[in-house]
């Protein structure tokens, strides 16, 4: 069986959104945007899920936790 990986690009300030909340943490249908991606990827048989964070990394990491 081959190893399958997924990478979530969750870096960016979201300055064009005119908000102090980091882009990937903006709620869509009651969940942060990044959570929708994690939920979909968790349905796959992945070896590893990697999340790339940048600006606001601590807040994104605290939401993502050990899911990625």
Curated annotation (Swiss-Prot):
Q: Superkingdom of this entry's organism?
A: Bacteria
Report any Pfam family annotated for this entry: NTP_transf_3
Keywords on record: Acyltransferase, Cell shape, Cell wall biogenesis/degradation, Cytoplasm, Magnesium, Metal-binding, Multifunctional enzyme, Nucleotidyltransferase, Peptidoglycan synthesis, Repeat, Transferase
| SUPFAM superfamilies (alphabetical) | Nucleotide-diphospho-sugar transferases (SSF53448)
Question: Which reaction(s) does the protein catalyse, per the Swiss-Prot or TrEMBL entry?
Answer: alpha-D-glucosamine 1-phosphate + acetyl-CoA = N-acetyl-alpha-D-glucosamine 1-phosphate + CoA + H(+); N-acetyl-alpha-D-glucosamine 1-phosphate + UTP + H(+) = UDP-N-acetyl-alpha-D-glucosamine + diphosphate
Annotated localization: Cytoplasm
Enzyme Commission no: 2.7.7.23, 2.3.1.157
- Say where the protein is mainly found: cytoplasm
This chain belongs to the protein called Bifunctional protein GlmU
| Higher taxonomy | Bacteria, Bacillati, Bacillota, Bacilli, Bacillales
């Amino acid at each position: 069986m081959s190893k399958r990986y997924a990478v979530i690009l969750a870096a960016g300030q979201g300055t064009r959104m005119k908000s102090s909340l980091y882009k990937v943490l903006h709620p869509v249908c009651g969940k942060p945007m990044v959570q929708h991606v994690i939920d979909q990827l968790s349905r796959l048989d992945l070896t590893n899920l990697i999340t790339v964070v940048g600006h606001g990394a601590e807040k994104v990491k605290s939401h993502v936790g050990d899911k990625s």
